Amino acid sequence: MPVLVMSVLAALPPLPPLPPLPAEPFTLPPYFDYGATFLWALSGALLGARRGYAIPGILAVAFVSSVGGGVLRDGLFLQNGPPVVLRSGGYLLLIALATLLILIAGARIQRQRHLPQILALVDAVGLGAYAVVGMNLALAAGLSLPAVVLVGVVNAVGGGILRDVLMRREPSMFLPGTLEESLALLGCLLFVALVKGLAINQLLGAWITIAVITVLRLLAIRFGISSKPLHGFREYCERQEP
């Protein structure tokens, strides 16, 4: 039977490759890109400081929190030379500055009343924005549509995954509660549907995707919308909690 199945599969004609989407340029405004990098580095440095890490540890957490997704995108998937964050000194300078601020005035910064709201807003906008940037670069590299979606999701949430692994925590995307990864995937699928399915201009589709994901993320934060464990395993999950 296995031989027969393999013979039938071998006789089938190869599937045609998926046509790539038009790779029109889409880039984030530099002030947003640098601003988001700085704030995410600040957030990562705060986490490292709260864990009691030494200066190298705080700097490492700040680095992966802010640009880890881009490093994974360029180094693992696109492989088109050194990652962008290493070709421009501005990113590393901002990460170092954020770490220095935490070392000097970390206790005062974390007491700022509006810091969580600012970080939540940047996170909401950046979730869709960096997903779109990752997909655009994947399109320019000629990747298939499933690969384009994968690169977009990794670019959006890869930094958080690396941060959790580095800090020996379960990645948040594996746990119920957060919707970041689900919304990033939804945004990538929405972008592909708009541009490929509805033939919308790629730049317009990018901004629509960013707007939709930003609104959904802010609504989830505002109303406490979260994911849940699978129904049949909820009791088991509760028993395993420390």
How would you label these PLM feature ranges?
Residues 56-64, 88-93, 114-126, 151, ...:
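Cytoplasmic-side transmembrane-helix entry/capping segments in multi-pass membrane proteins
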Residues 60-64, 71-77, 150, 154, ...:
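Short, structured motif recognition centered on aromatic/hydrophobic residues
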Residues 88-92, 144-149, 176-185, 199-210:
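Loop-to-transmembrane alpha-helix initiation sites
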Residues 1-28:
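Short, strongly hydrophobic alpha-helical membrane anchors
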Residues 62-70, 120-136, 179-192, 237-242:
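Small-residue-rich segments of transmembrane alpha-helices in multi-pass membrane proteins
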Residues 30-43, 61-64, 187:
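The first (N-terminal) embedded transmembrane alpha-helix
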Residues 42-51, 74, 101-116, 161-172, ...:
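C-terminal ends of transmembrane helices
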Residues 24-37, 83-97, 144-157:
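Structural signature of hydrophobic alpha-helical transmembrane segments
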